[in-house]
Amino acid sequence: MAALQEKKSCSQRMAEFRHYCWNPDTGQMLGRTPARWVWISLYYAGFYVVMTGLFALCIYVLMQTIDPYTPDYQDQLKSPGVTLRPDVYGERGLKISYNVSENSSWAGLTHTLHSFLAGYTPASQQDSINCTSEKYFFQESFAAPNHTKFSCKFTADMLQNCSGLADPSFGFEEGKPCFIIKMNRIVKFLPSNNTAPRVDCTFQDDPQKPRKDTEPLQVEYYPPNGTFSLHYFPYYGKKAQPHYSNPLVAAKLLNVPKNMQVSIVCKILADHVTFNNPHDPYEGKVEFKLTIQK
């Protein structure tokens, strides 16, 4: 018992460790002979080569089943979301306020519009084509250069008085501001049967404070009638249409009451667009609050 309980010295432990690392009597290194180390190394090398090959084969088969022209992620919404420019968000959604007599209060809003429309200049649309059919532009083949599909031009001048070309202030200076409305893209989405979807902007009453004897909102739409031409649909995806630009509709609000906050809703009217989803306030429509001080 005394021998078993005897503690080994540091030199004894180091000697045993060196003997384990290399045993000159048996020719073993770390408990195995060099030949066995070679065989076990070859076994693991072969094992991981086979596993890597199987993994690569699985990835290859998976990639062959994926359509490169279909987005990796798609929303579950059947109707496109709608966005507004300029977009200034308050605590509860879009809230825009400015003073007609103070240029600094609306300079940032017009800068947002100019920056947004920079992608709709003729130079930026030079790879797109002119479309005038007013019908759905179906493309079964990839006839455009680099195995892509054609995209229709949409330039800022199509927004006429709301293009920022003739009036750089977009009507904000005179209290008749322009707002640009855009539908989000959905691959192969057809908004209606045979009629172009259009924008309809109206005052939205507060259920708790209904307004009385108020005239309807007067709006000038650009392009005329506030329509999104059908030849911009369907959209085939970013890879198939790398030069695609969303069509736009500008709404110039003509009779917004001054010095008070009003709620405005702009809806997309089309056969296949819904705007009554209580879970998504931006599906098929956009709501915002506007205050014009004078």
Curated annotation (Swiss-Prot):
Glycans are attached at residues 99, 103, 130, 146, 161, 193, 225. Residues 1-36 are cytoplasmic. Keywords: Cell adhesion, Cell membrane, Disulfide bond, Glycoprotein, Hydrogen ion transport, Ion transport, Membrane, Potassium, Potassium transport, Signal-anchor, Transmembrane, Transmembrane helix, Transport. GO terms for cellular component: apical plasma membrane; endoplasmic reticulum; plasma membrane; potassium:proton exchanging ATPase complex; sodium:potassium-exchanging ATPase complex. PROSITE patterns: ATPASE_NA_K_BETA_1, ATPASE_NA_K_BETA_2. One of its GO terms (molecular function) is P-type potassium:proton transporter activity. It is a single-pass type II membrane protein. N-glycosylation is necessary for assembly and functional expression of the pump at the plasma membrane. Residues 58-294 are extracellular. Coiled coil: none annotated. Disulfide bonds join 131-152, 162-178, 201-266. It comes from the Eukaryota. Expressed in parietal cells (at protein level). It is found in: Apical cell membrane; Cell membrane. One of its GO terms (biological process) is cell adhesion. The chain crosses the membrane at residues 37-57. Residues 194-294 are annotated as: immunoglobulin-like. The beta subunit of the gastric H(+)/K(+) ATPase pump which transports H(+) ions in exchange for K(+) ions across the apical membrane of parietal cells. Plays a structural and regulatory role in the assembly and membrane targeting of a functionally active pump. Within a transport cycle, the transfer of a H(+) ion across the membrane is coupled to ATP hydrolysis and is associated with a transient phosphorylation of the alpha subunit that shifts the pump conformation from inward-facing (E1) to outward-facing state (E2). Belongs to the X(+)/potassium ATPases subunit beta family. NCBIfam families: Na_K_ATPase_bet (TIGR01107). The C-terminal lobe folds into an immunoglobulin-like domain and mediates cell adhesion properties. The ATPase pump is composed of two subunits: alpha (catalytic) and beta (regulatory). Interacts with alpha subunit ATP12A; this interaction is required for the formation of a functionally active pump and targeting at the plasma membrane. Interacts (via N-terminus) with alpha subunit ATP4A (via the P-domain). This is Potassium-transporting ATPase subunit beta. It comes from Mus musculus (Mouse).
